[in-house]
């Protein structure tokens, strides 16, 4: 199976400026992500950025990098520019790996590509079972509910499905399987352009979840349970220190 990995990387970050270039064990964060993606069996791994500092850093470690426009409103728009510049065929699989996940397992990068290849949906992603009570009502832990064939019915920051009777008795306990969404996506390249030309939906604005646009317009997203649970990404200086400690 042929697929390409694109790693959108922005220098500006409200909570951690310069995040892609943050040093972890002597290497910039974006290099850790690139190296993990390179193990997944992709034809090509590309860092997509609008910042020359990131371009220089990627070239310094021998990576492929695409300098994009600086007016994109989302990582998906940046992805579309890469698809156009590299003239990827409409049916080619593109995996979007976030640039702030230096410990992402290469196995799940391959898994999400395989997931899309084996389904008719234009888009695929992954989830993991929630095993900690703190995540149940944490709005940053996005939940997803699936139909019988593994297609997403809805994504929400709320606890879904709502177990009415059990939550009434023990509101802080996990009574049934809940699935937390993992923010890695595979797309068919042609669908990316379709997606970015849709107007943002009311639901995605309410939940602040871009993937809800796909469901709003009647398309499907297939969701598989990740074979390896990915560690949390890096959003804050505290997250960065945790990753540095893990790598040693």
From Swiss-Prot:
Superkingdom in the source lineage: Bacteria
State the compartments where it is located: Cytoplasm
- Any one annotated GO CC term: cytosol
Class of this enzyme: transferase
| Keyword field contains Transferase | yes
Principal cellular location given in the protein's record: cytoplasm
GO terms of biological process kind: CMP-keto-3-deoxy-D-manno-octulosonic acid biosynthetic process; lipopolysaccharide biosynthetic process
Q: What InterPro entries has UniProt attached to this entry? A: Cytidylyl_trans, KdsB, Nucleotide-diphossugar_trans
Keywords associated with the record:
Cytoplasm, Lipopolysaccharide biosynthesis, Nucleotidyltransferase, Transferase
Q: Which Pfam families match?
A: CTP_transf_3
Q: Name one GO molecular function term.
A: 3-deoxy-manno-octulosonate cytidylyltransferase activity
Q: Does the keyword Nucleotidyltransferase apply?
A: yes
Q: What is its EC number?
A: 2.7.7.38
Its pathway, per UniProt, is: Nucleotide-sugar biosynthesis; CMP-3-deoxy-D-manno-octulosonate biosynthesis; CMP-3-deoxy-D-manno-octulosonate from 3-deoxy-D-manno-octulosonate and CTP: step 1/1; Bacterial outer membrane biogenesis; lipopolysaccharide biosynthesis
Function text: Activates KDO (a required 8-carbon sugar) for incorporation into bacterial lipopolysaccharide in Gram-negative bacteria.
Q: Which family does it belong to?
A: Belongs to the KdsB family.
* The protein's name: 3-deoxy-manno-octulosonate cytidylyltransferase
């Amino acid at each position: 199976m042929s697929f390409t990995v694109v790693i959108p990387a922005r220098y500006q970050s409200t909570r951690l400026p310069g995040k892609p270039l943050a040093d972890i064990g002597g290497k910039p964060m974006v290099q850790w992500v690139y190296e993990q993606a390179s193990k997944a069996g992709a034809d090509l791994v590309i860092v997509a950025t609008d910042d020359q500092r990131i371009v220089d850093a990627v070239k310094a470690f021998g990576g492929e990098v695409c300098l994009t426009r600086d007016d994109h409103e989302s990582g998906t728009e940046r992805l579309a520019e890469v698809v156009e510049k590299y003239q990827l065929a409409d049916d080619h699989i593109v995996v979007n790996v976030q640039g702030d996940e230096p410990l992402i397992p290469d196995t799940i990068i391959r898994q999400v590509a395989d997931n899309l290849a084996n389904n008719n949906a234009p888009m695929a992603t992954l989830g993991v079972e929630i095993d900690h009570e703190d995540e149940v009502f944490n709005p940053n832990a996005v939940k997803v509910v699936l139909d019988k064939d593994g297609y997403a019915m809805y994504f929400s920051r709320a606890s879904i499905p709502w177990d009415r009777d059990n939550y009434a008795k023990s509101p802080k306990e996990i009574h049934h399987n809940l699935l937390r969404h993992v923010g890695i996506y595979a797309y068919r390249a042609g669908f990316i352009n379709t997606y970015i030309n849709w107007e943002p939906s009311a639901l995605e604005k309410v939940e602040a979840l871009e993937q809800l646009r796909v469901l709003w317009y009647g398309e499907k997203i297939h969701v598989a349970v990740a074979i390896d649970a990915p560690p949390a990404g890096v959003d804050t200086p505290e997250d960065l220190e945790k990753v540095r400690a893990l790598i040693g």
